[in-house]
């Protein structure tokens, strides 16, 4: 009888933290899977340093083309693009490249003190209205960490 109680107590002690973890972290894990979006592949002119500005929901602009499963976001030499496509909601693993002709060089978005080249992403709502919705502006900085800090 004592063995059954000891076993029951051990199961309770081990399972309690697991159950608490499921109740606390479970909704966040489920949210990650429910709010995925198609990833974007950003093509930035080779050597460009500065703010990238992508304006979405622009009535007279073309939609974003696709490259496999990616939305292809090719910005001009001034770091801008206007598209009639909507800014997708959710999370995805976006890719960032410098491009020149047909060659591409991957840019790291590793983060602080890790050699990253993509910084400070922001989403703004703009006053111009398309189909009853304001346009959206996505901005991020391309350059070294030092360049971003001096922006």
Task: Identify the role of each PLM range.
Residues 1-22:
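N-terminal Sec-pathway targeting helices
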Residues 23-151:
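Protease-labile, long low-complexity intrinsically disordered regions enriched in Pro/Ser/Thr
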């Amino acid at each position: 009888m004592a063995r059954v109680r000891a076993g029951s107590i051990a199961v309770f002690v081990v399972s309690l933290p697991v159950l608490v973890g499921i109740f606390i972290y479970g909704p966040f894990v489920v949210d990650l899977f429910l709010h995925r979006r198609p990833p974007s592949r950003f093509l930035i002119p080779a050597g460009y340093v500065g703010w990238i500005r992508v304006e979405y929901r622009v009535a007279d602009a073309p939609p974003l083309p696709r490259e496999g499963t990616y939305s292809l976001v090719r910005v001009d030499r001034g770091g801008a693009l206007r598209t009639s496509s909507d800014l997708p909601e959710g999370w995805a693993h976006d890719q960032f490249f410098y491009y020149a002709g047909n060659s591409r060089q991957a840019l790291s978005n590793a983060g602080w003190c890790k050699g990253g080249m993509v910084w400070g992403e922001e989403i703004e709502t703009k006053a111009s209205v398309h189909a009853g919705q304001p346009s959206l502006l996505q901005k991020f900085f391309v350059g070294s960490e030092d360049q971003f800090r001096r922006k």
